[in-house]
Each structure stands twice: as C-alpha cells, then as structure tokens.
Regions:
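Class I S-adenosyl-L-methionine-dependent methyltransferase catalytic core
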Residues: 1-346
Length: 346
C-alpha cells in the first residue's frame, strides 16, 4: 500500500474500499485500513468473509469475553463489517450476512459495484475467477496472487493489453492465524493501480558489455551452456527468431529483436522501456512463431539424460548450444526493447 501512496498520496482519498475475502476479526488488511481510516482519507471500509472462514466464537458465561471453541453457530452465513471511521483496536464490530459471503454472490457483487477499490488476499485456487470478477467491475483493485497463474492462457492477455500489471513488491512471508510464518517465493500483487516502479526503466548494458563484465551471465554461458571461453555469446533459440537471456539484468540495450527473459521481468516491467510480445508456454506460443521442437533436439535431449515430458511436436522454446547442450528454458516472457523517445530532444 505504501508504494501506491508514495506515487499518489491521495490514492485512497474519499474512496470506498471493499475487502471481499477478509474476516473482519482476523484480516490484517481490515486492521490496517481500520486503523488508518482518517489518515488515508477513506469514505467507507467494507470487509467481508466467506461462511466458516472466521474464528469459532462462543460467549463465556463467566466473564462475557469471546472464547475460541469448536462450536460454529451461524456457519451458513458470511461476515461483514462496515466502517465510516477509524477503529484502532482489534475489536471491529461485524454482523452476519444474508448469504455465505462468496465474492461471486449477488450480495458481494453489489458491494463491489458500490466500492471504488477492491483489495484482498484471495484464495489462490480462486485467483482466475476473482481476477475476471474484479476486471469486470472496472474498479481499481490489488490482490495477492500466484506468479505463475498470471501467465495462463486466460489471464496473460490482460497483461498484454495493459489491463493489469504487477505491484511494486512481492509479498513473500505470511503470518497464519496461529502465529506461524509461512514463506512463498512465487507470490505477487496483481493490480491496475499505478505505482512509481512501473515507470522506472531497468538499467541495461550493451551485448558486448554484458559478455565482458556481467559475471552471472558469463558463468551461465561457461558452465551451463559449455561455451568456448574465448567466444562467449548470446544463444539463439533453435525454433524461434529470438535470443535467450537467462537473467534479466543481461538484457542487452543494443538488441532490437525479441528476447526471452525469466518471468521475474514482470516485477520490473516498465511499459515505456519494454514491449510485451508474449509468453513461451501458453497456447499463443505457436501463433507467435515458435516452431515445433523437432526430433533432432529430442534425441540430443534424451542422450544428455533429459527426462522432461517433451515431444517433437511441442512448441516450447528450446536451445541447442554451440557446446552441444540441449536446453529447454523454464517459462520465458518474450519482450522487445522500445526505441527511446527522443521527441523532446533538441
């Protein structure tokens, strides 16, 4: 949230925020916006959760406090909290909803249509339907999702068209309700809210500068690709007109063709610097001109001990290096450098 505030200090000013997958009692999203309601200038905060997702509750007969028990009254109903002012403690008032709190229900969809922004940590198994539900609303949104899911056939076109992009940070550590810390390396923010990092170009060197000075690249060319140390170079794909760039910082500044880069490029993607051409592993690979792997590469791959589930008619990007090493790079994002804008130059 701080990245959006730094880029636009009034991003939340006068907004109604919907948190559609956030238990009013336990969600850190809810607590953050409830505590910072006035500072952010919110108009309204709505937090809802699915039936049965909250902490079991029962009122104690002895002291009137709420205790955790196995009993789950009113389980068919979701929970909702609606705030129009700050609440600085964790005792956020809430009520049961008429329905089960599923974000796809008419009840939650009506709240979506009322809101200005949708923010949450959606269950990863529901990421795609939630994404389409959010995009359909034409509202601003940001939610935590799985990095690999955004390159699927149905979701990647939203990236290509500029309807969504990745947030400024990668949430990697999560605190569970019992206090444990869980780490994930492939999570990201999926959003359509602008932030400053989207407009910061990645510093790049020329092809020759990378080969001479980029030690990570040199090590890959020597050790993984088995290249001649006196003739290091960027490898070309065997079945596509483009070069393989195994690490993002090795993208050459003087190469005008298509380059395949790791999916991590989406965390640093600057639309003013790069053109998004496509993804190497979804159904569009063939349409992009990626040819069949072919039997020769398959034979070399098997001879080198490869056990992956590849066939000659697949359209995955592959390399057959000058050192004779068959390589099938993991999921690649295809990009092309844009020409610098010199319209303002004298």
């Amino acid at each position: 949230m701080l990245a959006y505030l730094r880029y636009n200090p009034e991003v939340f000013q006068g907004k109604t925020i919907l948190l559609p997958c956030d238990d009013p009692e336990q969600s850190n999203f809810t607590k953050y916006f409830a505590r910072n309601f006035e500072r952010l200038g919110l108009r309204k905060l709505i937090s809802t959760s699915y039936a049965g997702s909250g902490r079991p509750r029962q009122v104690s007969l002895f002291d009137g406090t709420v205790l955790d028990t196995p009993k789950r009254p009113y389980e068919p109903h979701g929970r909702i909290a609606v705030l129009d002012h700050a609440i600085c403690d964790d005792d956020i008032p809430w009520n049961y909803m008429e329905g089960n709190g599923d974000f796809r229900s008419k009840e939650i969809t009506a709240l979506r249509d009322e809101a200005d922004m949708i923010l949450t940590n959606v269950p990863f198994s529901l990421l795609q339907p939630f994404l389409f539900w959010a995009v359909e609303s034409r509202k601003q949104f940001a939610f935590i999702g799985n990095m690999n899911a955004i390159t699927c056939n149905d979701t990647f076109p939203l990236l290509m068209s500029g309807q969504i992009w990745l947030g400024a940070t990668q949430p990697k550590v999560f605190i569970t309700p019992d206090g444990d810390h869980k780490s994930f390396g492939n999570t990201c923010w999926i959003t359509n809210i602008d932030h400053g990092l989207r407009h910061e170009p990645v510093p790049l060197m020329s092809m020759q500068e990378n080969i001479a000075h980029n030690e990570r690249l040199r090590r890959i060319l020597l050790e993984r690709y088995k290249q001649n140390p006196n003739a290091l170079h960027y490898e070309k794909y065997r079945n596509y007109n483009g070069i393989e760039v195994p690490i993002l910082e090795a993208l050459p500044s003087d190469y005008t063709g298509v380059a395949g880069v790791p999916i991590s490029v989406l965390n640093h993607f600057c639309a003013e610097q790069l053109e998004l051409v496509g993804c190497s592993v979804n159904a569009d690979a063939k349409a992009l001109g990626v040819r069949e792997i072919g039997g020769e590469w398959i034979r070399a791959y098997r001879e080198h001990g490869g056990t992956g589930n590849y066939t000659a008619h697949m359209h995955n990007l592959v390399l057959l290096t000058d050192g004779g090493v068959p390589i099938a790079p993991f999921k690649r994002i295809l990009v092309r450098l844009k020409a610098p804008d010199t319209s303002g130059d004298l």
